[in-house]
């Protein structure tokens, strides 16, 4: 991962200038494991591009994996709070051997087969795109889901968000723009938790 938070780690990150963080293999651009917390502060004036690794990791959030490990605590995601800055987050994607198909992670949220996590976007200018074919823009990677997504608030918060899942050339959008990744449904119940959009500008494709 470009930055890796695990255990009870807490990071208040203030963006300045132009920055890029790229995860390798199962690493997220900024990886936020179970119990960890990332806050991108309201004092952020810079830009960040965060890209997930090639095993289907999130741009910001959970790790990716090449196998079904979603129930494993190592594939669980912590808390992500964004209050400022200009952020572009792209999910990574795992190419299925001997095919042209991919399993992608979320732009912001879980990686492939990831579980859990809270996402709050309270400010900033955010562009989030799910990993190839299956990742949500904000939410779950392929077969993944998050617990809570909150956009905006009741105290004048005004995030500006553009979010999309990946558009396949023949199959169209397979993951949600905001919500679950492809195959993130269990017993016909959408496995993503609460989604609340309270204020700000939100443009979606998915």
Predicted regions and their residues:
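A composition-driven surface/loop motif
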Residues: 1-206
């Amino acid at each position: 991962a470009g930055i890796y938070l695990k255990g009870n780690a807490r990071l208040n990150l203030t963006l300045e200038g132009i920055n890029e963080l790229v995860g390798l293999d199962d690493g997220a651009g900024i990886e936020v494991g179970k119990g960890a917390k990332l806050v991108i502060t309201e004092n952020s004036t810079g830009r960040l591009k965060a890209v997930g690794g090639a095993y289907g990791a999130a741009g910001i959030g959970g790790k990716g994996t090449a196998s079904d490990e979603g129930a494993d605590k190592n594939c669980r995601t912590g808390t992500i709070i964004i209050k400022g800055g200009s952020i572009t987050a792209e999910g990574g994607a795992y190419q299925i051997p001997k095919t042209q198909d991919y399993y992608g992670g979320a732009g912001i949220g879980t990686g492939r087969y990831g579980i859990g996590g809270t996402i709050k976007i309270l400010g900033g200018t955010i562009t989030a795109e799910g990993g190839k074919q299956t990742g949500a823009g904000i939410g779950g990677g392929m077969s993944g889901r998050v617990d809570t997504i909150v956009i905006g608030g009741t105290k004048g918060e005004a995030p500006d968000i553009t979010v999309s899942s990946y558009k396949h050339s023949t199959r169209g959008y397979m993951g949600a723009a905001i919500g679950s990744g492809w195959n993130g449904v269990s017993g016909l119940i959408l496995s993503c938790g609460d989604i609340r959009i309270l204020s700000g500008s939100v443009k979606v494709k998915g």
